Amino acid sequence: MKKSIKRLPKCTQEELTVLLDLVCKSIGNCQMVILFGSYARGNYVLWDSNIEFGVHTSYQSDYDILLVVTGQTKYVERKLNRITNKYHDLFADRRHAFPQFVVEHINTVNRNLEISQYFFTDIVKEGIMLYN
């Protein structure tokens, strides 16, 4: 697993740093924060827009983030709504990527890694560890 976000654009690094700070301050039972998906692989889209059949469309990649926690995941998911709202407020003056969180208990992650469950082994291969 990679450990650095330095290859990502500066604006992305700033957004991820703010998200990580909000998560770490709000979720005491967080054991790991892992970026996965297009930003971790390097095939993300910062912003793309088109006009197709007279309709303007736009697209940007989101941040796929796995939170590995101890304790109840429902408690964490409620806090993530507040974290996401705060993040959007902080970056309201500019276009920014939307975070998508997956919350898993550490025992669930370990069990799935033991049986080589694709989702989790893919994260180990391609992910970027933001916090451990």
Predicted regions and their residues:
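Short, aliphatic-rich beta-strand segments
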Residues: 64-68
